[in-house]
Amino acid sequence: MSNTKDNFNVADLTAALGAGDREDLVNALKNKLQDITGKPTNVLECLSPNVRKRVEVLKEIQSQHDELEAKFYEERAVLEAKYQKLYQPLYTKRFDIVNGVVEVNTSETEAAAMDQDEDEDAVGKGVPDFWLIAMKNNDVLSEEITERDEGALKFLKDIKWAKIDNPKGFKLEFFFDTNPYFTNTVLTKTYHMIDEDEPILEKALGTEIEWYPGKCLTQKILKKKPKKGSKNAKPITKTEQCESFFNFFSPPQVPEDEEDIDEDAAEELQSLMEQDYDIGSTIRDKIISHAVSWFTGEAAEDDFADLEDDDDDDEEDDDDEDEEEEDDEDDEDEEDEDDTNTKKKSSAVRKRGVRAHAPAGGQAGERPPECKQQ
């Protein structure tokens, strides 16, 4: 593929993301294709009149389908909004228990057993490290959480999400107790979507974290001793970015000018944006709605079981393919043998074909390595 084509793919994708309009993306693709080929991209012009009429009817059918699909999305949005309201009282109860605002009712026998087993003052109230443990039990999020992050995430009291309408998208809110790391009590992450029904991300915005001096978890300070004989005897300090969950609140940004980014940088940017959205959607769709199951590890086991089922299905498919290959080879061997027998009927000794067994199916469904957000 030529550099011209490569540049058009990435540049137009970036331009469309920045413009926030899918129609711009389609038009850009058409224009570039026309520039490259020098021909219009209207397929209908290349068809015979009869075929063109049939395609026009198919387009009318597609329009009817699109109208129904639009109604489906509208009704689904109303239904989702209804149940989000019904969920809220449950989330409030969860917050109160996790943070020790209320105590669960226990029978006298259970209370006596608790008094014997542990000192209530030593244990404290609520469920310590609830959100930290829940997130660490998820494969996607555990890759982002470093040991340094854990101290700050112990102060996480609640996570909420809500849809936003202008522009379309959703917002995550992380509520923190007073802590020695930063002054913010709420950290937000907002995703602006080009199309809410199909997850096409335009951009993401995060809260600027107000770190206390020397407590920034997204940077590390390197000290280097001066060279011998140097006039400056003080050590040289250098600040570098480091891996941290809190980089999540500094998402990758799309340049406004497409000329500011080359092909390699555009591919890396797209990968980072996909990874960032994966983290956000995991928190929204899995952690918030099933927090206690992630805390206990049950949700992780269910995820692992689903992954194993997928692996088994893939291995069965591989075995079926291997059997088909063996059958095909058997058929070919028989055909070859028949041909040989026909050609060499007078021969007293005929060589028998040797079956070449296909190798057994390998490990299927392996997950690609996940990159950590820098």
UniProtKB/Swiss-Prot annotation:
Pfam families: NAP. Residues 343-355 have a biased composition (Basic residues). It is found in: Nucleus; Cytoplasm. Residues 372-374 form a propeptide. One of its GO terms (molecular function) is chromatin binding. The keyword Nucleus applies. Residues 26-80 form a coiled coil. One of its GO terms (biological process) is double-strand break repair via homologous recombination. GO terms for cellular component: chromatin; cytoplasm; nucleus. A motif (Nuclear localization signal) lies at residues 223-228. Keywords: Chaperone, Coiled coil, Cytoplasm, Lipoprotein, Methylation, Nucleus, Prenylation. Residues 299-374 are annotated as: Disordered. The modification Cysteine methyl ester is found at residue 371. Its main location: nucleus. A motif (Nuclear export signal) lies at residues 47-62. The keyword Transit peptide does not apply. Residues 299-339 have a biased composition (Acidic residues). PANTHER family: TESTIS-SPECIFIC Y-ENCODED PROTEIN. The acidic domain is probably involved in the interaction with histones. May modulate chromatin structure by regulation of nucleosome assembly/disassembly. Could function together with B-type cyclins in the regulation of microtubule dynamics. Binds preferentially histones H4 and H1 in vitro. Interacts with CYCB1;1. Belongs to the nucleosome assembly protein (NAP) family. This is Nucleosome assembly protein 1;1. It comes from Nicotiana tabacum (Common tobacco). The gene is NAP1;1.
